[in-house]
Structure formats: C-alpha cells, structure tokens
Amino acid sequence: MTRLDSVERAVADIAAGKAVIVIDDEDRENEGDLIFAAEKATPEMVAFMVRYTSGYLCVPLDGAICDRLGLLPMYAVNQDKHGTAYTVTVDARNGIGTGISASDRATTMRLLADPTSVADDFTRPGHVVPLRAKDGGVLRRPGHTEAAVDLARMAGLQPAGAICEIVSQKDEGSMAHTDELRVFADEHGLALITIADLIEWRRKHEKHIERVAEARIPTRHGEFRAIGYTSIYEDVEHVALVRGEIAGPNADGDDVLVRVHSECLTGDVFGSRRCDCGPQLDAALAMVAREGRGVVLYMRGHEGRGIGLMHKLQAYQLQDAGADTVDANLKLGLPADARDYGIGAQILVDLGVRSMRLLTNNPAKRVGLDGYGLHIIERVPLPVRANAENIRYLMTKRDKLGHDLAGLDDFHESVHLPGEFGGAL
C-alpha cells in the first residue's frame, strides 16, 4: 500500500507556498495533480509544473471569484465526462508578454487570486484555464478542482489554486499513478495525499449540519422529540427521533441506545417485503421507547444503500431477472453500498451523544461512525422477520456485505414467518 502524508502537512505546505500532490479515486481519473495556491505562484513553480505535467495549467476558483471576474463557461453544455467546469481562458491584461511563459502565467495566476482584481484586468482568450469549483468543495464533488480550492482555503489563503496532471516518467504518453507519484513526491520533497483523505478530514473537523426545528411526535411506541437537521452542502434533510434526556443537567451523553436508520421509502412507508427496513425501523423505535432514553436517527439520501430511489427500482428489475442485491447495483455501474455516515455522526454529536450502544447488524456502520468523537461501546443486534420475499436479500447481505445475520439457513419458504433474524440495511 502506498505511503501517504497527512492532510495537516499538505495544508501547511500550501500555506508556505509549496506544491503538493493530490491523488483522486481509482474509479475516477486515478491520477495525481500537482497543486499549489494561485496567490503563491512564481515563475519557478510554474516552470516546475510545466516540466513534470501535461502543461495544461488550470486555476480552480470558487464560484464567487468566477462571478466577480465574469468567467463564463467555456461551452454552454458541459460535456466533460467528469463534469470539470472549464471557463473561458484568460491572460493578465497588463504586465506580461505573450502570456505563455512561466513568468506570464504566474502573473495571471496571482491576478486571478487577487481579491481586488476585476473582469477588465484580463483578456480573453488566454493561456491560463480557470475552473469553477463546486460550492462545498470535495464534499460535493471529489475532484482536483475542489481539492485545490479547499486546500487554499484551509491554508488561510484565497480560494484559488493551480493544478495540472503529473505525467509518467517511465511510460511515455501516460499519466503517473500511485506508486510512481510516491517516488516523485519523495524525490522533490512534496506531500502526497488523496482526495478521500481530504474529504475525511473535512467531515471530522468541520460542521456541516444545521439544527432547524424541534417538535413533539406521538407514536404508537410513545412520544418522541423530532429534531430536524439540514445538511449544508448536500441539500438533504434528516430527522432524529429522541426519547428522554441525552445530555444535560441529568445526563452525560454516555451509554445512549442509538439506531442510525437509512431511508427506505419502499420498506418504511409502503411496507415492502423485499427488504427488512420497515420492521427494523419499527423495532428500533420500540426498543428505544422501552429503554426510555435513546435516538433513532433517520438518514435521508440513503435510499437503496445510497444509490437513490430510481436506481433502486432499476436494481429491483435486475433482481427479478436473477441478480442479487449487490450484483444488481454493480450491473448499474453503482457501488454496492454508497452510504456515508459522517453527517449522521455530526448530528449525534450535536444531540450530545458521546458513547452509544448501536442498534445494527452491519459492522460497516460501526466503522462509519467511528472517529467523530463518538465511542461505540456495544453493538446491539436488531431483530427483524425474514420472509419468502426477502430471504435471498438477507442472505446476500450476510454473505457479501458481512452483515451479522444468524439463523437464515434454517429458513423454509413453506413457513410464513419463521422467526426473528437480525438485519441492517
């Protein structure tokens, strides 16, 4: 496994005017970009970038800068397969020659990052390619564009970077990949990080939720407090059903019974027997009610293990044709499980939870909640009922996704509801 450096080192290097290398996901470009802060651009840095990269130098900017400078899309309908938001190319209007030299491009980069610059300070077209980053950075789009802007902002600089893809020194005509990038980083004293690490760092160190409303909700299991949250960057709403006092004068936030439940319209609302989600939700509410203290956190945006409702219905079509729940996702070009629990962890922290007994049979959920200042002291099995419609689904979760589901092999379709088995979507 390739050795990586810390995000903290990368941020410090960016602040100091050094370049870093950022690798994206293997399922995306699987390439490493040389990145530095645009306001720190020098002729030497640009020359180094040109020497070891493709030479197609881009300057990622946040949306506010693009709007201020009148940087319009390069083409009305973006057809780039990764959605990179190219704008019209530019040169600095004054202080440069032809615009192509390292010195000229460094001047243009610094001007793009200058908060006092205006649209008329640039000529169009030019030799530098500004890119528009998504609001929310890598949390919205895991690309090098957003990584550059995030790193600059985290370093206390203007949200403007300079990026270009590093080319292979071993395989002429190809881009450099992970192992070669590590060697290159060591040779030149550069930090090497991944976009995944940057996403994880931001999720752990920044708050991305807002508590919006709280209301009393009487249910057949008793009364809960429904506390509504919005996710700042994802335009998704979540709700926590809270019973009893979690933290406060008479509670310390420890030993809280918690269920983090993934949204499932078909199971939770329509009572679909293809999954075990509805019975799990009902059982979790009942168990928290009996406990007298706990949280059932209902996570929106997790439909179909994160692939969305329409894709889930398409996956059902494939399952009806013989695929299992995992293979169906993969046949659609989607991950077997695309859920992220970072927002859920932040909500639990906001509610005052410090340590919990987690209601789940999915070990991955436990891993997904670790590392956010939360301590999971126990995994509590959540019983549900298997039936003829969901038994194959449950077995696939057990066999391919590692869910802890005991007793499924004893199921017989001739028996209507054979007993209770744990399952966690």
UniProtKB/Swiss-Prot annotation:
Sequence positions that bind GTP: R259, V260, H261, S262, E263, Q280, E303, G304, R305, T325, T360, K365
Function: Catalyzes the conversion of D-ribulose 5-phosphate to formate and 3,4-dihydroxy-2-butanone 4-phosphate.
Binding locations of Mg(2+) 2: E29, H144
Protein name in UniProt: Riboflavin biosynthesis protein RibBA
Catalysis: reaction(s): D-ribulose 5-phosphate = (2S)-2-hydroxy-3-oxobutyl phosphate + formate + H(+); GTP + 4 H2O = 2,5-diamino-6-hydroxy-4-(5-phosphoribosylamino)-pyrimidine + formate + 2 phosphate + 3 H(+)
A GO cellular component entry from the record: cytosol
Keywords: GTP-binding, Hydrolase, Lyase, Magnesium, Manganese, Metal-binding, Multifunctional enzyme, Nucleotide-binding, Riboflavin biosynthesis, Zinc
Cofactor binding description: Binds 2 divalent metal cations per subunit. Magnesium or manganese.
Stretches for region GTP cyclohydrolase II: 205-425
Disulfide-bond pairs as recorded: none
Organism: Mycobacterium tuberculosis (strain ATCC 25177 / H37Ra)
Cofactor: Mg(2+); Mn(2+); Zn(2+)
